[in-house]
Structures are given as C-alpha cells and as structure tokens.
Amino acid sequence: MSMKSYKARGIVLHTLKYGDSGMVVYLLTDSGGRQSYMVQGVRSARGHGSKLALFQLMFAVEFEGLESSRMQMHRFREVRSGIVLQSLPFDVRKSTIALFMAEVLYRLVKECEPNQRLFDFVWGSVAALDALDEGVANFHLWF
C-alpha cells in the first residue's frame, strides 16, 4: 500500500469517537477542502491528553498527513498548533461562538475541493475571535 505524505493547515470542524481510543476528525484544510482524518490512541489513558487538546472545535492546526490510494480517510503523521490561542479555549463566550461557527461550517462545507479564500477567511476569523476583547457577542453575526 503506497502512502503519500503532504503538509497542510487545517481547522477542526467536527470530531467523532471511534472505538475505545480513536477518533475521526473532520478538518477544513487549505490544500484539500473538507477532509476526514483517523487518529488512533488519542483518548487512551497513556497520556496523549496534549494531542487530544489539539482537536477542539475551531482549533487551527498545522500537520503532516498521509494519504493512501486505497483509503478515503487520511491519517496524521505529525500535528501541531497552527495558531497559539490565548483566550478562545478559556472564555466561555468565545468557545460557544466557536462551537456555532464549527457547526455551521461542518453542515455547509461538503466539497473536497480546495477553497483557499474560504480557508483564509476562517483561519483569520479564528485568530480575530481569539484576539477580540469587545464585541464578542456579535462576532457570529459578522462571521
């Protein structure tokens, strides 16, 4: 089985529990539109909590992925934070807005074709929401 490696950026739109310790992560990526990734061992008791933290909704990640010609689902070789978020994970208002944004994008974006303008807009929106001090309550209207 031939595996092709590639580097990309993505934004977490949705996650699903898979088995005892795995999960399926749906990302909006810069190079391939909406794609699904299998992550094994992320929810096990062996201390992968830091990896699990990367897959919160609307978190921006940079990663090296593996694509197989036989599988529709991709895998991660390496994942790291794409934007260091200062307030989004800790502010309930911002987290709620991020949840809403992720749900809207997950339901609306179905294509697997790259859409660089949409990706850049969403990536910038995550950074803007994290940096915002005032007007947070109306951010979803702007989005």
List each model region and its residues:
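Non-catalytic alpha-helical scaffolds and adjoining flexible linkers that form interface surfaces
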Residues: 1-143
